[in-house]
Amino acid sequence: MPSKKALVRRPSPRLAEGLVTHVEREKVDHGLALEQWDAYVEALGAHGWETLEVDPADDCPDSVFVEDAVVVFRNVALITRPGAESRRAETAGVEEAVARLGCSVNWVWEPGTLDGGDVLKIGDTIYVGRGGRTNAAGVQQLRAAFEPLGARVVAVPVSKVLHLKSAVTALPDGTVIGHIPLTDVPSLFPRFLPVPEESGAHVVLLGGSRLLMAASAPKTAELLADLGHEPVLVDIGEFEKLEGCVTCLSVRLRELYD
């Protein structure tokens, strides 16, 4: 039976110092961010996910975006080497967490860089964004780690947003959804559904037809509901100021086994 565990990490007191690349910096309300994070974690739990907190990394402003520190396929965890040097201290606590869960652990080594937010898994196909945070050596090391396990790794150019999953994610049937102005090459995906809002391109598959989505994408939620999906909306506005989205606030572990 597939596992339903999700790694999460409490926001750092220095959250407001987090990196911004493609947006203008806005003031972050730390108290409100904590409330929004709690509600996000509660939403996962309410839909059957066991949330596991990674030890906080208070000196790492971006550490709440825990997805960037690891990529898991089958029972193998690839600890990333983030493209932003200031984020590399985030990986140690995540490595400890996945090791406790029994994952086999591999690492991305210099000169490779890889952010987990650049990795979109659809079945046995792994799309990896080649952009500002993930380089060619990182793509090669991801391929070396997971192709022997049966994965098909497809590199995708990313130039308009921070990460691949800032531009696209996927529905339960494998259809990729994305906001056209931010998607470099939509034709790379076998099935592509345009959505009307930037944050509407980000969904977390909760199980069945349920999709965790940002409250900032009501038009997309309406579109997806009309297609038979069940949007579950959460307000993550303080994290969106830092280019965060619903996917990067957790690491969903669906394929763990004893």
From Swiss-Prot:
<keyword id="KW-0378">Hydrolase</keyword>
<dbReference type="GO" id="GO:0045429">
    <property type="term" value="P:positive regulation of nitric oxide biosynthetic process"/>
</dbReference>
<dbReference type="GO" id="GO:0000052">
    <property type="term" value="P:citrulline metabolic process"/>
</dbReference>
<feature type="binding site">
    <location>
        <position position="87"/>
    </location>
    <ligand>
        <name>substrate</name>
    </ligand>
</feature>
<feature type="active site" description="Nucleophile">
    <location>
        <position position="248"/>
    </location>
</feature>
<dbReference type="InterPro" id="IPR033199">
    <property type="entry name" value="DDAH-like"/>
</dbReference>
<dbReference type="GO" id="GO:0016597">
    <property type="term" value="F:amino acid binding"/>
</dbReference>
<feature type="binding site">
    <location>
        <position position="19"/>
    </location>
    <ligand>
        <name>substrate</name>
    </ligand>
</feature>
<protein>
    <recommendedName>
        <fullName>N(G),N(G)-dimethylarginine dimethylaminohydrolase</fullName>
        <ecNumber>3.5.3.18</ecNumber>
    </recommendedName>
</protein>
<comment type="function">
    <text>Hydrolyzes N(G),N(G)-dimethyl-L-arginine (ADMA) and N(G)-monomethyl-L-arginine (MMA).</text>
</comment>
<feature type="binding site">
    <location>
        <begin position="67"/>
        <end position="68"/>
    </location>
    <ligand>
        <name>substrate</name>
    </ligand>
</feature>
<feature type="binding site">
    <location>
        <position position="62"/>
    </location>
    <ligand>
        <name>substrate</name>
    </ligand>
</feature>
<feature type="binding site">
    <location>
        <position position="133"/>
    </location>
    <ligand>
        <name>substrate</name>
    </ligand>
</feature>
<dbReference type="GO" id="GO:0006525">
    <property type="term" value="P:arginine metabolic process"/>
</dbReference>
<comment type="similarity">
    <text>Belongs to the DDAH family.</text>
</comment>
<dbReference type="GO" id="GO:0016403">
    <property type="term" value="F:dimethylargininase activity"/>
</dbReference>
<feature type="active site" description="Proton donor">
    <location>
        <position position="163"/>
    </location>
</feature>
